[in-house]
Amino acid sequence: MFPFIAGIINQLHTRFALIPKLLALGLLVSLSACSLLITGYNQAPSLLIFSWVNPHLDLNSEQDKQLRADLQVLHQWHRQQQLPIYADVFQKVAVLAPKEMTGPQICSIFDELKDTLVPLSQQMSPVIARLALKLTPAQLQRLEQQYDKDNKDYRKEWKLDASADKQLQVEVDKGIENAERWYDRLDKKQKALVKQLAKDSQYDQQKSWGERIRRQQDTVSTLERIAKSQQGLAWSQQEVTALLNRSLLNSPDETYRAYVDMRKDINCEAAAQLHTTTTAAQREFMVKTLKAYEADIRALVK
């Protein structure tokens, strides 16, 4: 269950490999509280290296210096080229929020955000390629080990080894948390609806888990191939571009692609259905929250 725009953004940008984590550089705006948004975004390159890249790769000083320089360039591009798109989306949803909304309307927002991934991945490709050319066997081994650790945490968070009822409850809890971020407190009937929508969502943990593992293995093998071949930046960038496409846009697993398309439609309809139950006060809360995000994002562009 992905309630409204928070879930749409999270579904787009919560990914499982090195590449998507790097792409999360400019997407802190979708995850931070308004009061922390500006500080978090302005420090995004350093925060990304500190919180994810170094724990997974343990960069040496030369790699760290190059990546920081590359991320600063990417960060500036993202600030000028993509933040205005996010601000426009928040503005658009703020206009829609007081009214009833349909599944197709919400899916159009999803598609608008998804479209930002193509130019973002194009800008990210040379950054990742330069880093990949410098990676050592020990760093790639460390990446695999950290993925194993991440996966244990993921299985624990989503209770993949527990009963179906406990897995469902995790989805419900996360759905309510996301919804209340935008609508404030839900009442009992709305929480019950979130639970029913989660039951009806056809979410398949095993499909998501399988794709997670595929992306991780694909990332490691691609980075290893680049590091070993040393065929230059142009070739390496092509390899990274193909990896980004497989990771973010078009999984090579046809069954998974069909599943994602189905889930998108279901989630959009679910979000519209939940929105229908909201009160005028809840919609006003959403409008105020959206406008606050929009204002902070536009301030970041200046």
Predicted features along the sequence, with ranges:
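Short, structured motif recognition centered on aromatic/hydrophobic residues
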Residues: 53, 66-67, 121-135, 143, ...
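Start-of-domain marker
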Residues: 39-78
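N-terminal secretory signal peptides that target proteins for export/translocation
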Residues: 1-17
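Bacterial signal peptide processing site
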Residues: 35-37
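C-terminal motif of bacterial Sec signal peptides marking the signal peptidase cleavage site
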Residues: 30-33
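Extended amphipathic alpha-helical interaction segments
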Residues: 129-253
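A cross-kingdom marker for long, charged
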Residues: 50-51, 209-302
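Mid-chain, structured segments of secreted extracytoplasmic proteins
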Residues: 80-119
